[in-house]
Each structure stands twice: as structure tokens, then as C-alpha cells.
Amino acid sequence: SGGTVTSEEIEKMPEKSIAAVASTVGGVFSRDGEVGSIRGQRSSGTVYYIDGIKVTGSTALPQSAYDQISVILGGIPAQYGDATGGIISATTKGPSRVFGMGIEFQSSGLGEGKGLDAYGYNRLGVNLNGPLIQSKNPDKPGAILGYFIASDFIYQADNRPTAKGTYVATPEYIDYLTQNPIRLSDEGTGVWNEASFVTRDDLMFVKQNLNTPKLEMALSGKLDVKTSEMTNLSFGGSFNYSNYRGFNFTNSMFNYDKNVQYLSSTWRVYGRFTQRFRSSEDAKIKNVFYELQADYTQYNYKYQDAHFQDDLFSYGYIGQYNTHRSRSYEMATVNIDGKDVDAMTFAGYVEDSVTYRPGTQNQVLANYMSKYYELFAGETDYYRNTNSILAASGLLNGYAPSSVYNLFGTLGSNQSGYYIADNQQIGVSFKASADIGGHALQFGFQFEQKINSYFSASTTSLWTLMRSRVNSHITELDTENPIPLMDENGVFLGVIDYNYLYSATSQST
């Protein structure tokens, strides 16, 4: 069971992606115009194929490249492996006998107030096809070597439109918050976010979500070589590139400049050899056919801060904090050379103050802490140590200001994650068929190898992790080896020092 949608039908549809077209087939559960599920399975149970290649990465193709899209819901052939949901298979167009060219341009403008709508959708599609080498045999006309190339270039000013628009801070208010991110708390307990006192006059209504553009490119090509009357060699491939900023409601009012950047690219190539064999009408074995295919797919994906990219330690960096400490002593009885001695013994270091020098990587957060030190100038209790800074709603490297009413992120709050993936797939398949008497026989094999690798980091948490690990191997005093202080005459001064005890098992750097 299932269905097939032809290129003529696809051309009449408003949305022409593989998933959107497949969702029009009966039996496919649709969600937001895309494939939700097939036969009640999760999305992972649906397997996509493009020109016989099992899809890894993006399924996007140029809109003019589709020849047909087939959906198999039940009775899945063995050649598709262990798919538990359904199969969605797209076949791209091949070369034609005569040269052809098509250009298509769609546009709704460049954004809010600059076109038909606020979202700025623009698409340019170009396709070329035709013969490269024609047969010179008048009895067997046609192309010996033909090609088909299609491309789509898409730009959207807002890739995730909202139904009714949204409120955002005015540029003037953003500038004000940049220079004045905090104010003194009326309760005398530290500072408050200035953004928590936003009023309607500080906001403006927009239909287009800010800083959510998307650039996408899709290419597809096919080269057919008619090596003989009964054999055919085909080469093809596709490439997709996407670069966009993700919409985040939390960031939408104040912090849209920090929307995450998503980058992905998928390219796949294949070679296919097909041969058919002649058979007489009275032959017991007819319609003998086989096909051998090899393919390769490369998929890369990344999300990151668009400015910092792979500079992971800049994500959470606010500035340089220097802790000033002094030695602490307490009266205790210590045994030295078999004698108990009352002396002032070293008890460790105490923090006197933490000074701050702003960094340049995150200007808003740097201003936040500069303002903090300005508001509490001379009041050392608010920056005696890192705990006192945090208790008064100050920031350390890796920290972000508290949200506004638990709804919106504060201006300057950084993207906290970084992720990069590199996936590769190699496939080889062979299939053959023949009619033997009144029976149809099909057989073949398939080999598939995948290599999936990735790296991820909670970038702002790196600073918290480093603070917890630094000097973790010298936290205890070596009280077994006291160091009495003597004057120049060898007289005990009543003071005993200790070195820190090294713990190899706690060493983390």
C-alpha cells in the first residue's frame, strides 16, 4: 500500500519538499505540513531514499529536480531492509533528448515593510537538461550522453514566522540597557536587572522575528551514458547547504542578537550500472535484468555562536577576576620534636577582595560587572570573594544574568552550547530480477557502512568546571610536617607554617 506523486502533481503543490509531498499520500500522518508518522511509528521508523541512496542528512533537493515521490506504507520489499514504519523514495529527473532550460523566481519581498509580507521569502530556481553527445545512427536516434542539472537558491529574512508577530525592545532601549544593565536593589541585597523595569514605551511590535535569516542552496545533477543498446551507466549526486539563525522565544524581546547559528551541508554521489538481456518469446527465462550501484554520503552539522564559533572559552568570558588573599593564623598546640608547643599556626588563606578587569568578548556582560563595581565602590563586602559577588547577583565567567520575569533572556546572555557532527555513509547494492515461467524472481544484496562522529561542549559551563578543578590537588595542609619560624639567632618566634599537602589522586590538570 502507499502511493506515488508525479512531477506534474508536485508542480501544482504550494510546498514541494519530500516530506510535504509525502504527507499528501493517504495513510501518512501529517504534522505542520510535514510527515508526522507512518503506521504509528516514530519518525526514526521512516526511511528516506533519493535515487536509491539511503538518506543520511538533509532530504532537500531543488524543486524542479523531482521526477516522482513514492510512499510505501505496507508490504515493504526486502530490498529496503528493516524499516519499521514506511519508505519515502524520491527519484530525480533524467536527461532529455533535446536541450531545455527553466528559470523560476519567487519573492515576497525583503522583509517587513519591504514587500508583500514581513517574512522576505526569495527563491531562484534554475535547471538545464539535454544531450551532450547524440547518436549518429539514424536508425537509433537519441542521446548517447545526456545531463540534467537543477539548482535552488533560497533566502528568507524570517525562517520561523510567528502567527501574530511579537514585541521586541526598541533600538534605543537596547542601547540604554547596554550601558546600564543593572540598578541597585531597593531591598539592599545587591542589584536588579534594569530590563525588569521595561515598560510598553520601551517596546515595539514587529511581524518579522529579528535576526532569524536563512540561506539555503540545493544542487542536483545526473549524467546518463548509454554504453550500448542494453546497458546504461548513470552518475549523479546532490548537494545541500543551509545557514540560518534559530528563532528562540526566550531571546526574542531583548537578546535576539544571540540567536544560535545552525550550519549544515550534505552531499551525496552515486554510480549505477544497469544491464538488460534479450530473450526470445519462447524462452523459459525472460526479462533478465541486474543493477549494480555504489554511493557515498557526507553530512556535516554544527550549531554555535555566530561570532565566537569554535573559540569555546570566549562564550562565557566576562573579564579577568583577581583574588587577593592574606595568610590566616590561629592559636593551637603543636608537637615539635616530641614537645608540645603553643603557637600561632597557619590555617590557610582568606580572601580579602576580588578585583575585576572587563574583557572585550562580551561587551554587555562586561558592562554589567563594570557597573556592579561602580555601584559598590568602596564596599568591599560585595566583592570580598566570589561567593559574595554571586550572592549580590553579580556575575563570574560562565554566568549569565537572571531572566526577566522567568520569560525572557537578559540582553547579553550567551549561547551556552557548541556542537559539531561529521557523518559518512558508504553503500553498495546489487539487485537482479528475471521471469522464470510464470514466476518472477528477485534477488540481491546490500552493504552499508556508517561512521558517525561528533563533539559537543557546554561552553559557558567550562568556566564553572575550571574553577572547581583548579588547585584541587592542594586543598589540605601538611600538618605532619610543621615549619617553625625562627629569628636570626635561632629563637622560636611562636609561629608555625605549613606547606600544602599534594594529593596525586586529586590532580585534574
Which residues does each predicted region cover?
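Periplasmic N-terminal accessory/gating domains of Gram-negative outer-membrane beta-barrel systems
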Residues: 1-77, 84-87, 107-108, 127
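Short strand-turn segments of transmembrane beta-barrel domains in outer membranes
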Residues: 68-76, 87-133, 151-153, 165, ...
